[in-house]
């Protein structure tokens, strides 16, 4: 064992995934390559506090869609960690649990630019920042200046934990996919075919 070897890195992509689409998969794959991640674990939220008041598809359906979407990539896995947890799903709790499961690894939490910018509003933000590196998948028009200035001012010690990287512009959103299904519009090529077929078979998003 080489004690001087750098610690292994695991990527975590949390989200509602209602449904998961190619935008999520492209960001995860590019982050895996860019940051030399051993693998990326997708963790569908169980009871997301930021979605209170909005109808969210059952955790079982969302988990199954993610499972089908990642099954052909040996570097991707799906976990039901948050789904099995009672109460609201908070990132700080998930990161603590992941540290117990992977004590010898560094964690890299992958998120979109908008969520990246809202990290300061997350529960126990100081603990969150200390538990993981954060990778923000940037998009055209995203200006990180204000966010980075706030980070330098309030949490300068965590600046090395924050990373931004550019991903190809994919104008795909879960909200748009749900709307298209409800309106009877095609969603082929917006998400994996296995997920599209699951939506069709189960009748999700039609109401």
From Swiss-Prot:
Keywords: ATP-binding, NAD, Nucleotide-binding, Nucleotidyltransferase, Pyridine nucleotide biosynthesis, Transferase. The keyword Transmembrane helix does not apply. It is an enzyme of class 2 (transferase). One of its GO terms (biological process) is NAD biosynthetic process. It catalyses: nicotinate beta-D-ribonucleotide + ATP + H(+) = deamido-NAD(+) + diphosphate. Its EC number is 2.7.7.18. Pathway: Cofactor biosynthesis; NAD(+) biosynthesis; deamido-NAD(+) from nicotinate D-ribonucleotide: step 1/1. InterPro entries: Cyt_trans-like, NadD/NMNAT, Rossmann-like_a/b/a_fold. One of its GO terms (molecular function) is nicotinate-nucleotide adenylyltransferase activity. Pfam families: CTP_transf_like. PANTHER family: NICOTINATE-NUCLEOTIDE ADENYLYLTRANSFERASE-RELATED, PHOSPHOPANTETHEINE ADENYLYLTRANSFERASE. Catalyzes the reversible adenylation of nicotinate mononucleotide (NaMN) to nicotinic acid adenine dinucleotide (NaAD). Belongs to the NadD family. NCBIfam families: cyt_tran_rel (TIGR00125), nicotinate (nicotinamide) nucleotide adenylyltransferase (TIGR00482), PRK00071.1-3 (NF000840). This is Probable nicotinate-nucleotide adenylyltransferase. It comes from Desulfitobacterium hafniense (strain DSM 10664 / DCB-2). The lineage of its organism: Bacteria, Bacillati, Bacillota, Clostridia, Eubacteriales.
